[in-house]
Amino acid sequence: MIMYDVKITAQRKADYKDLQAKYENPIEHTCDVQEGQTWISHDGMCPEGMCESAWESMHKFVEALARGEGDFYDGWMRNPYSAMISCNDGFRPVSFLLERI
């Protein structure tokens, strides 16, 4: 089976300080992903240095793109071999563009 590489690009990073102040316990280390940062997934595997929480949110889409699948949710993306996925951090979500390459 042919497996494609998938490029993962951090597109946007939000920071909801009001929600953090109201609900979050103080933490030592926050997300260090930078907008524009990229990773390449080979064979649908988690790239080195990828945030585990972000990977958990996106891995099913990365694996599907790596297998050549696409057109998620019946035409959701202009490029059928891509997806826009956000990590599951409700205080500092990052939006990632996944693209089959």
List each language-model region with its residue ranges.
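Short, compact, well-ordered microdomains
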Residues: 58-101
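Hydrophobic residues positioned within well-ordered beta-strands of beta-sheet architectures
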Residues: 6, 41, 94-96
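A structural detector for beta-sheet-dominated domains
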Residues: 9-11, 42, 99-101
